[in-house]
């Protein structure tokens, strides 16, 4: 008779690829329209002025400008806004 039971293969050794979530452009940084500001699961950050939201809750710039992170409202929601870049006056 066998002294030990046959060794099975390990059931570990698997992991999913990281999704690279998080803030991609920080407060004070200049962004172009279409730039991704935050990749997230759910609305950890909410879109504010000049910021759009994708179907996967990604926040992106709708206009060129500077990123600003705010805490707004009674619910103290973390909100991202873009302060639009001032267009140079035509001479």
From Swiss-Prot:
SUPFAM superfamilies: Ribosomal L27 protein-like. InterPro entries: Ribosomal_bL27, Ribosomal_bL27_CS. GO terms for biological process: translation. Residues 1-21 are annotated as: Disordered. The keyword Ribonucleoprotein applies. One of its GO terms (cellular component) is cytosolic large ribosomal subunit. Keywords: Ribonucleoprotein, Ribosomal protein. It comes from the Bacteria. GO terms for molecular function: structural constituent of ribosome. Pfam families: Ribosomal_L27. Belongs to the bacterial ribosomal protein bL27 family. HAMAP family: Ribosomal_bL27 (MF_00539). This is Large ribosomal subunit protein bL27. It comes from Azoarcus sp. (strain BH72).
